[in-house]
Amino acid sequence: ALANRIIAHEGVLDGFGHVSMRHPTDPGRYLLARSRSPELIEPADIFEFTLDSEPVAAKGVTLYGERVIHGCIYQARPDVNAVCHHHSPSVLPFCITGIELVPVFHMGAVLGTAAPFWDSRDEFGDTNMLVVKPEEGQSLAKALGAHWMVLMRRHGATLVGTTLRELVFRTVYSHANAEIQLRSMLLGKIGPLSRGEAERTGPHQLQPRPMARAWEYWTTRLEKSGEMPKSGRGGKSRAAKSRAGNKTARTRTTTRPRAKR
């Protein structure tokens, strides 16, 4: 819930888009919210899904149609533990023109040396532009390959991370990089980071200290705006409540009542 709200508050997500993370104790499942605007997500909105994107327990709840994006990427990339799909207005011009999005300042190096493109037309012809079929999700995951970001022609972008905080960091700063690249192109020819600079700078930015500093900044901004999810005030997700309930049930079953004296 917090990651959704941070990315929305920083102007990347709007009423649409979604963020997920691989289940912390079961790599064969992932956690994703029900179909709701990211800035409104609460812990109780989070549900578990199999890697085939089937809900584990979400009867009567409207779900994201594009959840196959997440499941297919988790299947293809065991190293990935968090995924974000968005339609950032700063990134969309690159998705529309086909101009390469490259790191143009040091913080933008977290997107990699360049983001590859995926075009649904290449395999599926004219569609409704939504990635809702398993074969579409698999095709997108293939285009992502070993990269950290893939641009979806005429649609948006999908990013991944090895942790949720890394994903948030990469999502926010690739959005900023796109805005800076757009502005720079208006002035003239851009001078992006070299491959060597990007390969050295990206991992440096993703060290614990820089990420902790950024996370503190984002959460403080969110708190000051009064938009912190209930988890910031002690709330629990449905997945956490379910695990707690199962644990309580097991305890009640296995613990024998004491005899009265």
Question: What is each of the regions a protein language model found here?
Answer:
Residues 1-261:
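Glycine-rich flexible loops
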